[in-house]
Amino acid sequence: VNRSVKWCSHLSIGKAIADLAALSTGERKAFLDGIVEPDRHHERIGRGVSSRRLSHHRASERLIMLHVWMARRSFLRNDDYEGYRHLGMALHYLQDRSVSKGFLGFTHDAREARLAKQRVPMAAIEDGMRRYMATPDFVRRSISRTRPLKDPSKIMFQASFSSAAVAAAVLDARGAKEAGREHRRLRKRHALILFPLALGSLAVGVSLSLVWMSPFPLLISVPFTIFAVHLDMPYRRSARLAEWNGISRH
């Protein structure tokens, strides 16, 4: 499949998102440049002679989230060019996750050629830009739920919806004030109650086990520690959300 066909679907989805988000000329160029960047200049991992080219059709959730975080942090620094470029790269990898490689990859190029003939379903773009949450956890779930498909129309629909939802989540900066209030509340609970409870129960268990030369006190303390850690999960989520909104976690 020639390069223009491989880029066609990415650019079509990108242009639809750029139109709906009303990006300026400069923002649009950076975004669309980013969305074809992985095909234009293949990313590599490792260093020197041990480096290898990254297969973007097998891009990991971690790699996509790396570009998502780089985009978000760039926007928080008012570096819109880098923000839109990294967002475009993240969406490229996300869209490629929708395309099944087939047996030994032999059908992949043919599937991409058929996909290039598909029109972008604007209903999926609009739906994605409505049905989102501006949180890193939402973005991660969207990535993990994107599955390789074989039917071109289903591929285009899934790629369009997930790309629009992730783009909207990354671009939405309206929740910073509320996220800051919630994080401060949970941070106080974490510092005064849950962290001391988890650490204290574990310390008591270890101390009694050493004094009694028995593992049972430690075994008894472990469930209390796990319970305290479980109760503290909202704090950890709020800490990620605070970072997402450029708020100090401490």
What are these regions (language model features)?
Residues 1-78, 85, 103-176, 195-203, ...:
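N-terminal, motif-rich segments that launch catalysis or mediate targeting to/interaction with membranes
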Residues 82-104:
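Active-site alpha-helical segments that house and flank conserved acidic catalytic motifs
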Residues 178-196:
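Juxtamembrane/start-of-transmembrane alpha-helix segments at the extracytoplasmic/lumenal side
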Residues 80-83, 215-216:
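Structural motif marking the loop-to-transmembrane transition
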